[in-house]
Amino acid sequence: MASADTVSWTGDYAAKVTGGWITHPWLANGVSIDSRTVASGELFVALVGDRFDGHDYINAALKAGAAAAMVSRVPDAVEMEAPLLVVPNTQTGLSALGAGGRARSRAQVVGVTGSVGKTGTKEMLRLTLSAFGSVHASVRSYNNAIGVPLTLANLPEESDYAVVEIGMNHSGEIAALSELSRPHVAVVTTVAAAHLGNFNNVDEIASAKAEIFVGIEPGGIAVLNRDNPFFRQLRSAAEISVEQVIGFGCATDATIRLIKYDASPGCNTLTVEIEGNPLVYQLGADGLHWACNSLAVLGVIHGFGENTHTAVRCLAGFQGMQGRGVRHSINLGDGEIELIDDSYNANPVSMCAALELLGTSRPKHSGRRIAVLGDML
């Protein structure tokens, strides 16, 4: 059972926000949806999917140290003494926990969406905002109807900032997640031909991304890619509910304007202007796409009124993320190969960015540049 100084959920409060009931009193220090990784003291949520049923793993989760399990039914194999939170539906219950976590939080919340660059921007925000206070952010790419409420359910009450990644597969999804997370700042990294599966064209994607403004808090801020063809459409949607729009990019009227980008592996130099004030900084992650993401980060920092000079000092050590353009040196016989690993995921936009990065690379001894590509499935 969780100790009192680490408790994030009591059984009574969880029952109150979910409309459920508890079999026995319990205290939990977090929320988990995976019995294989549940940590001691966490509440295990028995989600049900097309190919799995978390109720089959309740005993495994409790044996691993879970403080309790949230269930919609009690399997015969579960002991009567087991600490449970019984709810009508565990997916709905998880969303209710997310809403409860958000309601008691004092954090300034940043919602991040976009066709590409969401996770990288979220990680840079996690890093830079930590210079100004405690930060809670989405794990990996937990950005859907499960990941967003899970992020909010695990939001510590004392966090100063929360960074919530918000993705989508269909229209209406971002609106619901925005209303759940209620961001103070909404970031749209870009709009492009990615995740087209349930959309007829990119215009529909732009409209879906604009749903992030639906749940924005009063006095909120929108941070938008000024160079994107859909900037005006997004700005019009944002201005219905936000107080300020911050544009980033190369455009002359961008609030956060990129003046110059000098690429050098592991130490890229950016010269920018923030409302006309010059700022020079280094960025460890390689590629112009990472540079653009860093401009969005500066837009958030500027919107919060924090010191951008302090923030950019964090970016020099940011080397990107595993599978997203990280460089590896591999010894091969008498020579050496530099591998740029961009294998995490792919869409036409991210593939172009990867090829552009490869194209600007300068192999030693006039070596060749080789692209190894797979299907986009």
Regions found by a protein language model. Give the residues of each.
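N-terminal leader/targeting and accessory segments in enzymes
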Residues: 1-96, 100, 368, 377
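Active-site flanking residues adjacent to catalytic metal/cofactor-binding acidic residues
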Residues: 41, 164, 224, 340-341, ...
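Active-site beta-alpha connecting loops in nucleotide-dependent enzymes
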Residues: 49-52, 321, 343-377
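Conserved beta-strand scaffold positions in the cores of enzyme catalytic domains, especially
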Residues: 84-86, 109, 134-137, 245-247, ...
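Buried hydrophobic packing segments
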Residues: 94-97, 125, 129, 151-152, ...
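Acidic, Mg2+-coordinating active-site environments of NTP-dependent enzymes
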Residues: 75-80, 187-338, 360, 366-367
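Phosphate-binding loop of NTP-binding sites
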Residues: 13, 93-226, 230-243
